[in-house]
């Protein structure tokens, strides 16, 4: 195993798969055609703050959530609009508290002349879809009460993979969609 040198307090990663995990999503980097236009959108519409400017890219922080968004303009980029039908990113989903908050976001998007699809309800919750200036698909999502309760239970303790599938099947009533693998 190769490890890179680091601070003295760091230790080499273990090969014990049970000990290896990640703690959440750290950041996302989006390729854009115009840094200024994209920075304006993400600061004015979603409340990000541009913190670093590398010339070719910007690092933006959302102060409330701590989420980091990088906007990158590649010198040799194609300049074409985003399509979720190509391999890669389908959309970026952002968390909302509930359906009422989504309706508030509808109003904000309307006031800022951002095109959106009205709030839609699904088996697991509610979503509001819109796009950034490059056509990158964005979504605000709020789980319904049943899914929120299941997520709270999942976060409260450790589950085996089989237990996790049981929660999806029983608590959410989504047995037809549960991805059970035959042994």
Language-model regions, residue ranges each:
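A short, sequence-level motif marking secondary-structure junctions
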Residues: 73-77, 144-146
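Short beta-strand/turn micro-motifs at beta-sheet edges
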Residues: 14-18, 77-82
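Alpha-helix termination/capping residues and helix-transition junctions
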Residues: 19-22, 45, 86, 111-113
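Core segments of cupin and vicinal oxygen chelate
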Residues: 19-20, 30-75
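A generic structural signal for short beta-strands and their flanking turns/coil linkers
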Residues: 56, 67, 88-90, 112
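Vicinal oxygen chelate
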Residues: 2-18, 25-33, 80-183
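Catalytic cores of nucleotide-enabled group-transfer and carboxylate-activating enzymes in metabolic
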Residues: 41, 69, 104-106, 114
